Amino acid sequence: RCHDNKYDPIPARDYYQMLSTFTTTTRMNVDVWPDKVTSAITTKKAKDKDTPPQKDATRMMICGEGYDPIVMHTQGWPFFDKTYFLKRGSTDMKDGEAQQGFMQALSTPGDAKRWQWQPPAGAKFSGRRRTLSNWITDVDHGAGALLARVIVNRLWQHHFGTGIVATPNDFGKTGTPPTQPELLDWLAGRLIANGWQLKPLHRLILSSQAYRQSTQRSAEKEAADPAN
């Protein structure tokens, strides 16, 4: 946010361009709590209301200067309609408006409009999130190849306990290199070839010789491969 990534080729400008995708997103509170939870909260609020006030806290609220209300954070509205590049992450140092863009390290040089999606006339949404999804799943020019590897690694971790990349949240320089890069690439290719369907990949992993090996421990096996 305030400077370029020190380890991976991710400049701060990429951050703000990605951030602009969600600038116009409207956040709303949705009532999805069941009656049982709502009743418990109401009871707790009534109990708190009957609790004698804390003198020190009350004095602080009455006499203190306090802070200006932050409507954006408490109510989720209104929102900024623009995103700006900020020097050193400071809101006092705007460096021009940031248009929607994506990570340069995961994009081939060229016109970014290849991912752009225009909503129909009269639509009440910008289409930015659809554009983002087009870039994320583009295996030829966007982040699709990395996305496939990340998904495959998560599935492998789910079934084996540890991913082919032991740091599933970090595929960068500070993460752990894959133990079997060829296998990771091959499985990612299978995922893409199957139209991003996860079920065939689950079936493939579960029917593999690696998964069907015995998990019984012995001193001889532990000495040969203590990390397994």
Spans of features found by a protein language model:
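Primarily short, surface-exposed interaction patches in extracytoplasmic proteins
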Residues: 8-9, 37-228
